[in-house]
């Protein structure tokens, strides 16, 4: 039953769907609010970024619907092909990609720009989950099983850093370490994994004046609030001015071309300004519920001899948690600017589409787990409230 291409939507996790819909709704409202000024200046009307986000939502919803129909066994069988596709796309973006803000990260398509790094996150999770299932005993006992991962992930990291995209590289490294930990790899293997990655990133950071300026900026943005510290200082002023209840939806001052990237990397600052700490608590609570539900799905899907499905869900949860932590940390001045979006909320077509695809994977795995545990499609049909 679990490998069927059929699906009864009444067997889906209703709470998980509602949480995602709530985040998407907040995202659409905030994309419209935070982008009106920059959209008016760049394109002559206020709706440009909102319309593109709605289009991405439609495409992402289609992706999620298609993924819901695909048995997880199919993703396991073709995990290597999906990872290879990601590497090819990362290579193509270096040749044919569109450069924005000094980084070449987007492939220009007919109707939109696509960021291959977003797909690479999903492909990495699928590939690593399959690898850890196939070599689960070796990973716990033999360090070479972990070292072998350096070749494919080293190639991927190299392609990402050439764009350059340090944020995605750090995020995927975190997903790699987290999934290894969940798979039962000994602590000493994390030293083998983390130290080389940290050393390489440190060398690249030191040799990049632009990146070093970002590090110095987040350490003390007020030292040069009109120079390298301008973006972060404006973000902090936005967050601080929101108070408890905020200035009201649409009433942000910083989004009026004072805060660069107000609709993308720094949307959290605009959200805090307009909704206050009350809104921030609600938003973070929704993310907390999302992660809690995904960890519950992963725990239920765990099979000692076949942990692929559980590891995929854990990987998606770690990915979302990492993006949330880094994005909020950047807005608060805890981390240097990384260029990672708030899942489902920040403007970004590729990010939204791939986030919905990832949720489709989680929902499919949860659906299969319910079937395996004795709830047939007929039982689900007889009890429409099941899974809500």
Swiss-Prot record:
It is a multi-pass membrane protein. The keyword Glycosyltransferase applies. GO terms for biological process: cell wall organization; FtsZ-dependent cytokinesis; peptidoglycan biosynthetic process; regulation of cell shape. GO terms for cellular component: cell division site; plasma membrane. It comes from the Bacteria. Keywords: Cell cycle, Cell division, Cell inner membrane, Cell membrane, Cell shape, Cell wall biogenesis/degradation, Glycosyltransferase, Membrane, Peptidoglycan synthesis, Transferase, Transmembrane, Transmembrane helix. Its main location: membrane. The chain crosses the membrane at residues 16-36, 54-74, 82-102, 109-129, 144-164, 167-187, 189-209, 233-253, 277-297, 310-330, 342-362. InterPro entries: Cell_cycle_FtsW-rel_CS (IPR018365), FtsW (IPR013437), FtsW/RodA (IPR001182). Its EC number is 2.4.99.28. Pathway: Cell wall biogenesis; peptidoglycan biosynthesis. Peptidoglycan polymerase that is essential for cell division. This is Probable peptidoglycan glycosyltransferase FtsW. It comes from Thiomicrospira cyclica (strain DSM 14477 / JCM 11371 / ALM1). The gene is ftsW.
């Amino acid at each position: 039953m679990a490998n069927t291409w059929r699906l009864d939507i009444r067997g889906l996790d209703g709470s998980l769907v509602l949480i995602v819909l709530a985040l998407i709704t907040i995202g659409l409202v905030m994309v419209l609010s935070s982008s009106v000024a920059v959209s008016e200046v760049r394109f002559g009307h206020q709706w440009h970024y909102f319309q593109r986000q709605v289009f991405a939502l439609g495409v992402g919803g289609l992706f999620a619907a298609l993924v819901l129909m695909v048995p997880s066994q199919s993703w396991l069988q073709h995990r290597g092909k999906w990872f290879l596709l990601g590497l090819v796309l990362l290579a193509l973006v270096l040749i044919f990609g569109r450069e924005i803000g000094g980084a070449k990260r987007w492939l220009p398509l007919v109707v939109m720009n696509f960021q291959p790094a977003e797909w690479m996150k999903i492909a990495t999770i699928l590939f690593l989950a399959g690898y850890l299932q196939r070599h689960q005993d070796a990973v716990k006992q033999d360090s070479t099983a972990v070292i072998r991962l350096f070749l494919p992930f080293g190639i991927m990291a190299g392609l990402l850093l050439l764009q350059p995209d340090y944020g995605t590289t750090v995020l995927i490294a975190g997903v790699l370490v987290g999934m290894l930990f969940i798979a039962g790899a000994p602590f000493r293997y994390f030293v083998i994994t983390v130290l080389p990655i940290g050393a390489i990133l440190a060398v690249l950071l030191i040799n990049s004046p632009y990146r070093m300026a970002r590090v110095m900026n987040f350490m003390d943005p007020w030292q040069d609030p009109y120079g390298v510290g301008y973006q972060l200082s404006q973000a902090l002023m936005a967050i601080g001015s929101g108070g408890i209840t905020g200035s009201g939806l649409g009433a942000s001052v910083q989004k009026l071309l004072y805060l660069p990237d107000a609709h993308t990397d720094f949307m959290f600052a605009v959200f805090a300004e307009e909704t206050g700490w009350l809104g921030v608590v609600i938003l973070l609570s929704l993310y907390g519920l999302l992660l809690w539900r995904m960890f519950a799905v992963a725990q239920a899907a765990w099979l000692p001899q076949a942990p692929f499905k559980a590891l995929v869900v854990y990987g998606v949860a770690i990915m979302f948690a990492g993006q949330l932590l880094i994005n909020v940390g950047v807005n608060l001045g805890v981390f240097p600017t990384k260029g990672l979006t708030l899942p489902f909320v920040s403007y970004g077509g590729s990010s939204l589409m791939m986030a919905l695809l990832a949720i489709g994977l989680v929902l499919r795995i949860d659906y299969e787990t319910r079937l395996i545990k004795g709830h047939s499609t007929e039982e689900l049909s007889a009890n429409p409230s099941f899974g809500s």
